[in-house]
Design a protein with these regions (language model features):
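Active-site pocket-lining/capping segments in soluble small-molecule metabolic enzymes
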Residues: 2-123, 127, 141, 145, ...
Length: 821
């Protein structure tokens, strides 16, 4: 395999991290600006820094991708458009995007700028890659939940495929997580995830009993280990992946340096035909940051072995145990299993009280003060309060490794490009300077001054070399010099410096153009950012009820539901049969109501054929609508012309550009993101080309995950077949005593629901009057009797039979009146 087909892609949340990535051997770097990126808490880059970064990266033949991977509100489209123009004109190599509205807008105003589908787009199958290509994506970043075989299938579609190889994992499918949003108003889809998955939780039953009490389990039940693929990197390369992505825009530059350095060596060894990873690289990777390591879902579906349930952050490396304590308990003898150096940071996993840390500032070995100590030796160091005999000692910071890492981005770390110089000085002619880099690019400069005979000191090669060697502010260093000259000539130093500067600038231009030819600059556009507001069509809003059993369909119809949405992710753990779909359709038709079917939000490769067949069945049943929740199912469903397709909630519809995208895709309707406010909903209704739907009652899904906490901790999932009873009520309990229901769908995926039901009884009439075409009750977490009561209540409110009550006790109005950050 040629090297050009493999791209090592590094993160950069700061200038130092960018330099570290380039110097350590990255082929490409991804980073974010001050807005519209999914890591809003990183330092990120302003426009001046971005331009500087493009120059620096391209000079070293490193590609630069910019994250524009948040959901965007209509009020931000003007600023976004200006940003897109800037990114196009400054010469970045591509954008990583989530929002289909951003994709549509970028294609309209900066059509030459390559677009990559972010992992936030939840591409989970090869048909999802087809969808992304159809939407204009040159590359798809796959969901981290795919196996090697599934990645291979995605790679077969003719698009570039990017996959994560190292770093932090999300427990939820990226782009499908509302946990941070619903708990604290900080939306991961808007780049402000507060990482509540790294907090402690209890696993509770219906009686609020801790199911893990007394068991060998930690509290961080949603905190995965870090991904590390060095053991299986050849299999990923063989699968056909083009870009190998290291996670870590929030990480310090030392982390970037060490991880990129190790993966660079690993990839190069594969390309050389002798794959190996030195033990030193494995140790460095572990030391720089780890929550312990996993290959995630690449080799199999893991359970508890994927989780860092005892610690959600850097655990360091175990280097020994406390062998002795002095009587004051402030000095300890540590028996070392690994070397220790002055300046190292240590953490003691103490028996009582958790963990305490210190930095080694003085160390005795055999009674002598030492700078370092080897494995097997015993050293005496100062320790903090709380340390006891036999406590484990972890090194969380290795001073020598940090010094090594800082060589990649410190003041002396500049990675320079060798140039060969030819200087001519002929009497009666300008002096010329020709610089040639290691790839044959040439820069030329000459003096305004005409070379004269020397009156005093003649110019010699040493003098020329001294001036040509002054390349400190450039990206070059002088590799060789040829000085061709007449005898006894002179040229002022200032003139020579100017010719050198001209040659450097010309070489810059040649080198940059050879790597990334300039695209057409765009300074204005005619695209209308937001459609003209129109008066919403006057019609009665349809009450939609989402059911996952025929029993609930019957209850909802009897209570007055006008549209039944059947199927999708079924919280009763039962896969609806063909007979179930037929029964539901028959009941709905008999009642004279609208029938709709729903797909799950996650579809893996092996399930594509099943759903292709299911669409044929649905076509025969003639539903009024089919709700699509997975982008990979859109191309399959479009083949069935009789189906009226609706873009459902999981597709993250947040702005009018996205609504126009779905109209152009042939959608018959769209369901808005639950992260929108009432004001945003009203605005979108006024400009939408499609009928819109909003959720008004039920528990919002906070997470969907291939990981199952019940199966992992109670069902011995890691040992093979899961023994956990999915019908057993299960909850996550947090530090504030909130209880989040856990349900398992028909594909054994875990869904975590909000602790509070969404309820809009007090506002549903207003939503109907505002023109929301369909109002949804999610009945999947209710029993049939309770669902019937709720449907009847909303039917009466919308019909004016009862005065709209205040919201039901213990419920929430979600984001309708608070929004997200």
């Amino acid at each position: 395999m040629e090297k050009k087909t493999i791209e090592l892609l590094a993160p950069a949340g700061s200038w130092e991290a960018l330099v570290a990535a380039v110097n350590a051997g990255a082929d490409a770097v991804y980073m974010g600006g001050k807005a519209f990126g999914a890591r809003a808490y990183a330092s990120n880059f302003d426009e001046e820094e971005m331009a500087k970064a493009v120059y620096f990266a391209h000079m070293h033949h490193v590609r630069l991708y910019i994250t524009v991977n948040t959901l965007v509100d209509d009020s931000e489209l003007e600023a976004l458009s200006a940003y897109l123009l800037f990114l196009n004109n400054v010469g970045v190599d591509g954008l990583i995007v989530q929002d289909l509205g951003v994709i549509r807008l970028a294609q309209k105003i900066v059509p030459e700028l390559p677009l990559h589908a972010s992992t936030q787009m939840s591409i989970t199958n090869s048909s999802g890659v087809d969808f992304a290509m159809g939407a204009g994506m040159e590359r798809s970043v796959l969901a981290r939940e795919l196996s090697l075989k599934e990645i291979g299938a995605a790679c077969s579609r003719g698009s570039e495929i990017e996959t994560f190889i190292h770093g932090a994992l999300c427990v939820c499918y990226s782009g499908q997580c509302l946990m941070s949003s619903l708990i604290g108003g900080r939306s991961g889809n808007r780049g402000r995830c507060a990482q509540p998955c790294r907090l402690p939780y209890k696993l509770l039953n219906a009686k609020d009993e801790d199911m893990l009490q007394g068991k060998d389990a930690g509290q961080y039940l949603l905190s995965p280990k870090d991904m590390n693929t060095l053991s299986i990197l050849p299999q990923l390369i063989d699968a056909g992946v083009v870009s190998y992505k290291i996670e870590g825009r929030m990480k310090r530059p030392e982390y970037v340096a060490v991880v990129v350095d190790a993966y660079r060596r690993a990839i190069d060894s594969y390309l050389a035909g002798d794959y190996n990873v030195p033990e030193e690289d494995l140790a460095n990777i572990e030391q720089i940051f780890n929550r312990d390591f996993t290959t995630a879902y690449l080799e199999r579906r893991p359970g508890r072995t994927m989780m860092s349930d005892r610690r959600p952050n850097n655990r360091g490396v175990l280097i020994g145990r406390v062998a002795k304590l002095d009587k004051n308990r402030n000095k300890a003898v540590i028996k070392l299993d690994k070397e220790l150096h002055l300046g190292d940071g240590l953490e003691f996993w103490v028996s009582v009280g958790g963990r305490v840390g210190t930095t080694v500032t003085d160390m005795l070995c055999g009674g002598n003060s030492v700078q370092s100590a080897a494995p097997g030796q015993q050293v005496t160091i100062d320790v903090p309060n709380g340390v006891r005999l036999n406590d484990r000692v972890f090194r969380t910071l290795d001073s020598r490794l940090m010094s090594y890492a800082q060589q990649f981005f410190g003041p002396d770390a500049k990675k320079r490009i060798p140039v060969d110089a030819v200087v001519t000085a002929r009497l009666g002619e300008p002096m010329t300077v020709t610089l040639t880099d290691d790839e044959g690019n040439v820069g030329y400069g000459e003096t305004d001054f005409i070379v004269e005979a020397a009156r005093k000191r003649a110019l010699d090669e040493a003098g020329v070399r001294k001036q040509l060697d002054r390349l400190g502010t450039t990206e070059y260093f002088l590799n060789s010099l040829i000085f061709e000259h007449d005898e006894n000539v002179m040229v002022p130093m200032s003139e020579m410096n100017e010719a050198r500067r001209m040659a450097c600038e010309a070489l810059d231009a040649a080198r940059l153009n050879a790597f990334a030819p300039a695209r057409t600059a765009v300074h204005s556009f005619s695209e209308q950012l937001v459609p003209q507001a129109h008066k919403a069509k006057q019609h009665e809003s349809v009450l939609v009820v989402h059911c996952d059993s025929v029993e609930k369909v019957n209850a909802a119809l009897q209570a007055g539901a006008e549209r039944i949405l059947f199927g999708g992710d079924c919280f009763n753990h039962q896969l609806p049969s063909e007979a179930d779909y037929a029964k539901a359709a028959k009941l709905v038709r008999k009642a004279g109501r609208q029938m709709a079917f729903a797909t799950p939000r996650i579809i893996k490769e092996v399930q594509l054929a099943y759903f292709d067949k299911l669409f044929t069945l649905w076509e025969e049943l003639q539903p009024d609508f089919v709700y699509i929740n997975n982008n990979g199912l859109w191309p399959l469903a479009k083949k069935h012309a009789a189906l009226n397709l609706v873009a459902d909630m999981s597709l993250n519809i947040f702005n009018s550009q996205t609504l126009q995208f779905w109209q152009e895709q042939g959608a018959a309707g769209a369901v808005l993101s639950p992260e929108l406010t009432m004001a945003q909903v009203e605005h979108l209704v006024s400009v939408s080309p499609l009928p819109l739907e909003c959720m008004i009652q039920g528990r919002l899904e906070m997470m969907v995950s291939e990981y199952c906490v019940g199966g992992s901790f109670l069902g011995a999932l890691d040992k093979g077949a899961c023994r956990f009873n999915c019908a057993e009520p299960l909850f996550l309990g947090d530090r504030k005593d909130a209880r989040f229901p856990i349900v398992t769908d028909q594909f054994c995926r875990m869904h975590i629901l909000n602790a509070h039901e969404l309820s809009m009884t007090a506002n549903v009439q207003h939503m109907a009057e505002a023109g929301v075409a369909a109002l949804r009750i999610d009945g999947r977490d209710y029993d049939a009797a309770r669902l019937g009561e709720l449907v009847a209540l909303y039917r009466k409110i919308l019909g004016g039979a009862v005065e709209a009550p205040e919201n039901l006790p213990g419920t929430t109005r979600g984001h309708y009146f608070r929004g997200v950050m």
